[in-house]
Amino acid sequence: MSDAPAESAPAQIDPAQTDPAEQPVQILPRERSDIPDAVARIPRPPVPHLDPPFALRVARLGDADMVAEWMNRPHLAAAWEYDWPTPRWRRHLGAQLQGSYSLPLIGSMRGVDLAYLELYWAAKDLISRYYDAEPYDLGLHAAIADVKLVNRGLGPMLLPRIVASVFATEPRCRRVMFDPDHRNTTARRLCEYAGCRFLGEHDTTNRRMALYALDAPTTDR
């Protein structure tokens, strides 16, 4: 769906568990540390639900080999710029699983894993520097592993279902954010198809993003 650029404050790294040459690497490069305590205390994002034949589950450390292989495929390496080796992916997944900022997910169809997603609190993420974030705004990044499935209608089919589940599971969330690279026409078309509001293009440290918000439906009483 959208790329996930490396930026923001460094996360804590245990020197005993990392190669000295890798110690300066930020484990969760988009996570902010300069946030209010009330935002920092919000627990990790909810797990969305999808009806069969699709499913979502929380990623495990054992998925690191699979996710690393996916993210080193050319179409995802270009979009995400997270073409890391397995050890770094294991740390990236572990940091998310141990924290409350972002939740890594694996998407499947008929029992076959085919997508990697990250559902994160936007107020804890670098994008909150570029719009007026509410504490329970959520953001979503998604990657379809098989290039043959890209542009085959999976995004338009599944995005509304995932977002509807997010709103149902966490009613305090009133919008879901997307921040594709401004050149990512596929992701931008999907945002527009889903009914997102365009919040402009913004220059970050290493790229220019197009910011979108998908608002929760309102109920007329």
Swiss-Prot record:
Quaternary data? Monomer.
Name the Pfam families on file: Acetyltransf_8 (PF13523)
Q: Please name the PANTHER family in this protein's record.
A: LYSINE N-ACYLTRANSFERASE C17G9.06C-RELATED
Q: In which pathway does it act?
A: Siderophore biosynthesis; mycobactin biosynthesis
Keywords in alphabetical order, please: Acyltransferase, Transferase
State what protein this is by name: Lysine N-acyltransferase MbtK
GO MF annotations in UniProt: N-acyltransferase activity
A Gene Ontology biological process annotation? Answer: siderophore biosynthetic process
Similarity-based family: Belongs to the lysine N-acyltransferase MbtK family.
For the region Disordered, what residue ranges are annotated? 1-34
Give the EC number(s) under which this enzyme is classified: 2.3.1.-
Q: Which EC class, in a word?
A: transferase
The beginning of the lineage is:
Bacteria, Bacillati, Actinomycetota, Actinomycetes, Mycobacteriales
Task: Describe its function.
Answer: Acyltransferase required for the direct transfer of medium- to long-chain fatty acyl moieties from a carrier protein (MbtL) on to the epsilon-amino group of lysine residue in the mycobactin core.
Tell me the name of the encoding gene. Answer: mbtK
Active-site residues annotated for this sequence: 179
Question: Any idea which positions bind substrate?
Answer: 141
